[in-house]
Every structure is written in structure tokens, then in C-alpha cells.
């Protein structure tokens, strides 16, 4: 428990804000968590469509995401039932000109060596290039002297066109949500270091069996409430300022409330607005953003894919937008026949939803050689236009600490090793809570 409990407000009920609130509560500080939306989770939350609770975007966690997994356990999530744990894999439909790469359950680095040896769809020169990349990256300590794009890094390491198309580019999009031609090579290496370059379990892929709100944010709110804190949804912050006694005054839903510390855990643009209102004089570095689109396709009950997840060969020129497909019926008992297709590409937003869904359904029918997949019963398109920041080389990201006692920032956009991921958000929330606690002690 803290020696002197401080009353702290956390503004924003996304994953970063929930992580900050749990960390503060764990350290004995009374917390008030404010979320302007009706549900917790921010850009990773459950949404209702056609009587089903799905996600506003399909997410994969890695076994390396220890801070996320530890906090989930702390708030009462059973990791064994909350996830389908798969070995690291990249598998394309058998009728596509793709690859089949699955890491066996062997100790590292044997699991990667055996996976590479057994991989189909890769030629000898592709496998040698992958082995060369892995060994050199390890020798370098997964560090670059100067950041560059992922595409430039792959060129320096003489990676083959086929390996880039089938493995590196899809991995880059999945991890950073930024095209390889624009993505930070150092951040990409950070993700590879903590997955491919770590223990076998760290490279495991964790597919959620719960909707994203239930996976952490809702349990986090229950956790802090059990410890006497409060969590308020639909709680719009109207103003934030500091009084002469160095306490923070927050106006929420026409009420003024007073706190010793504040963590701003909103997106960057709203954080900047609040910093301006508080008269901090701080200016956050500018960010650009990338979209993610999820296309849900409902088929007849019992319609299944051979595996829960596949990588797809995308080709915007041929109206093949899908990059990954998930059979949610293998993850959620009440979602038989529901497929989720993930698209990270700017061109598709120029299409109407009906045209986009039809194109994706045709892509699945062709990729799996199953004509019935061209005709779903219904579809739903969900686009997060500012899903992640563009993770470009040498990007300046703000620190959690602001230099103002009792005030910190939290969010996946803050300074850290990872791109805009759930682990990045949770790590930032933990760090922000620690910074506020330390600043109020001095």
C-alpha cells in the first residue's frame, strides 16, 4: 500500500487508461476512471452487430506480451480459456501460391530452425535469406545504428522478393499497421526480438476467445471498483485546470471534482486539447494515422475454415483486399459461420461497403476454392480511420512524464519500443501510473 494515498483521475478508458487505473489501485491510490464513450476499450473494444458481440478490430496478442498477460491475470482473466494459443505460423490457403510455416513446440531457437526446414512454399534461396536475416539480427542485438524503413532493411539483408511478399510484408502490416516502404525498421526489429528472437512461448500467437472489452477493460473496471475506486462511462471531460494549491480540477458532466494527479489516457489529439486547456504549454509531436478495416461475413451455421486463421495474398489491383481471415466460430461458441477479414490498405476506403464486402467474399471463394463463400448471408464493415499512428522511422513520440508534478500521459502513441499495439498501450499505462506516483512523492 502507498504511504500517503493520492486521489488520481485517469481520463480515457481504453487499454492504456485501464492499465494505469489498475496499477494505481494496486499501489493503494484511490482512482476515478473517466471514459466519454458508453463502453470501455477505446480503439479495441467489443461492438454489437446483428445480435452478436464482435470486435471493432480483430487483434492477435503474442506470448511475448507479458505486461498485458500479467495485468489480465491480476484482474481475474483466465488466460487458458481467454485465448486460443497457437504456435507461430504463417499459413496461406492451400490453393494460393503462398507458404506453410509453423513453429513446432520445441525450445528456442530449435523451433525456428525446424519450422524453416519444414516450411513449404519457400525455395532454397528464400530459406537461406530468412536464416541469414535471423542470424544477423541476433548478432546485431536487434539494434540499428540509424533507423530506416523496413523495405530498406530487407533490401540490405538481401531478402528475396518472394520471402518479402509472403512473410515480411504481411508481418510488418500485422505488427506495425504501416506499409514496409514507410515503416520503422527499428520498431519492427523490436517486435521480432521479443517474439522470433525470444523463447518459444514468446512467439506463440494468442487469439482472443472473448470480445476485446471483456478481455481486459471491463475486468479492470471491476477490479478498481472492488478496491473502492470508480469508473464512469459517458463521462465527458469539459475542462481541466490546476488550482493555486497545486491540485487538479476536472469538470465532468457539469460537476467539478478535485484530484492530486491526472493521467491523460486519450488519443493524442484529445490529449493535446486537454494540455492546452490546462495551460501546460506542452506541444505533442505531430502524428499521422493509419486505418484498419474489419469485414465481417456471416455464412450458414457450421460453415468452417480448416484452421482458425489464414494469411491471404492481397492484390488491390485485382480487388483482393483481404490480408488475414479469422474463423470466429472456432474462437466464439455463439459465432458459428462468422468470418472476420482484416484489411490495412488505404485504397479500399474509396469503395462503398457493399462493393468492398462483395470483393472480399469473392476473394475468399477463390482462395479456398469454395464457391459458397462468395455469397454470405450478411456482412458488416467496421473501419477505424485512426486505428494506429503511422510507425515511421525515427518517429518522435512523447514521453509519459510531462515535467509537471502529478500529470502524465498514457497511450500507445507515447515513447516505447512497440508500435500501436495492446501491449504498447498497457505498457504506457503502467509507466504513466508509475511516473505520477513518483512525481507526487517528491
Language-model features and meaning:
Residues 68-69, 73-74, 78-185, 189:
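Mobile amphipathic helical/loop "lid" adjacent to a hydrophobic cofactor/ligand pocket
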Residues 25-49:
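Glycine-rich FAD pyrophosphate-binding loop
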Residues 6-33:
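N-terminal Rossmann-like FAD-binding beta1-loop-alpha1 element of flavoenzymes
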Residues 324-442:
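Conserved flavin/dinucleotide-binding core of flavoenzymes
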Residues 238-354, 363-367, 398:
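Mid-domain catalytic core of redox enzymes
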Residues 191-248, 252:
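Helical element adjacent to the flavin cofactor pocket in flavoenzyme catalytic cores
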Residues 45-63, 133-138:
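Glycine-rich active-site loop/strand segments that organize a redox cofactor
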Amino acid at each position: 500500500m502507498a504511504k500517503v494515498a493520492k486521489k488520481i483521475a485517469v481520463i480515457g478508458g481504453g487499454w492504456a487508461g485501464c492499465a494505469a487505473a489498475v496499477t494505481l489501485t494496486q499501489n493503494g491510490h484511490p482512482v476515478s476512471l473517466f471514459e466519454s464513450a458508453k463502453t470501455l476499450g477505446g480503439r479495441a473494444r467489443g461492438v454489437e452487430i446483428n445480435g452478436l458481440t464482435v470486435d471493432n478490430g480483430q487483434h492477435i496478442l503474442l506470448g511475448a506480451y507479458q505486461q498485458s498477460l500479467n495485468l489480465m491475470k491480476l484482474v481475474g482473466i483466465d488466460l487458458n480459456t481467454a485465448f486460443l494459443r497457437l504456435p507461430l505460423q504463417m499459413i496461406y490457403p492451400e490453393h494460393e501460391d503462398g507458404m506453410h510455416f509453423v513453429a513446432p513446440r520445441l525450445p528456442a531457437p530449435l523451433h525456428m530452425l525446424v519450422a524453416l526446414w519444414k516450411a513449404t512454399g519457400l525455395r532454397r534461396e528464400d530459406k537461406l535469406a530468412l536464416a541469414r536475416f535471423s542470424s544477423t539480427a541476433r548478432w546485431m542485438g536487434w539494434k540499428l545504428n540509424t533507423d530506416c524503413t523496413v523495405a530498406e532493411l530487407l533490401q540490405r539483408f538481401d531478402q528475396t522478393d518472394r520471402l518479402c511478399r509472403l512473410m515480411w510484408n504481411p508481418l510488418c502490416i500485422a505488427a506495425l499497421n504501416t506499409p514496409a516502404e514507410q515503416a520503422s525498421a527499428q520498431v519492427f526489429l523490436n517486435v521480432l526480438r521479443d517474439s522470433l528472437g525470444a523463447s518459444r512461448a514468446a512467439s506463440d500467437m494468442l487469439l482472443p476467445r472473448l470480445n476485446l472489452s471483456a478481455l481486459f477493460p471491463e475486468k479492470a473496471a471491476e477490479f478498481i471498483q472492488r478496491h473502492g475506486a470508480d469508473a464512469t462511462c459517458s463521462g465527458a471531460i469539459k475542462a481541466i485546470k490546476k488550482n493555486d494549491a497545486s491540485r487538479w480540477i476536472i469538470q465532468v458532466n457539469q460537476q467539478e471534482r478535485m484530484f492530486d494527479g491526472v493521467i491523460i489516457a486519450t488519443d493524442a489529439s484529445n490529449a493535446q486539447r486537454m494540455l492546452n486547456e490546462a495551460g501546460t504549454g506542452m506541444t505533442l509531436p505531430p502524428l499521422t494515422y493509419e486505418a484498419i478495416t474489419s469485414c465481417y461475413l456471416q455464412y450458414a451455421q457450421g460453415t468452417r475454415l480448416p484452421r482458425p486463421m489464414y494469411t491471404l495474398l492481397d492484390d488491390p489491383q485485382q480487388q483482393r483486399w483481404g490480408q488475414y481471415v479469422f474463423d470466429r466460430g472456432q474462437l466464439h461458441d455463439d459465432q458459428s459461420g462468422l468470418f472476420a477479414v482484416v484489411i490495412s490498405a488505404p485504397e479500399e476506403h474509396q469503395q462503398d461497403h457493399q462493393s468492398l464486402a462483395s470483393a472480399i467474399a469473392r476473394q475468399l471463394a477463390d482462395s479456398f476454392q469454395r464457391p459458397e463463400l462468395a455469397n454470405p448471408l450478411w456482412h458488416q464493415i467496421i473501419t477505424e480511420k485512426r486505428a494506429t499512428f503511422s510507425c515511421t522511422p525515427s518517429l518522435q513520440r512523447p514521453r509519459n512524464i510531462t515535467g509537471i508534478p502529478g500529470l502524465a500521459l498514457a497511450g500507445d502513441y507515447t515513447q516505447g519500443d512497440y508500435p500501436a499495439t495492446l501491449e504498447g498501450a498497457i505498457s504506457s499505462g503502467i509507466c504513466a501510473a508509475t511516473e505520477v506516483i513518483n512525481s507526487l512523492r517528491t
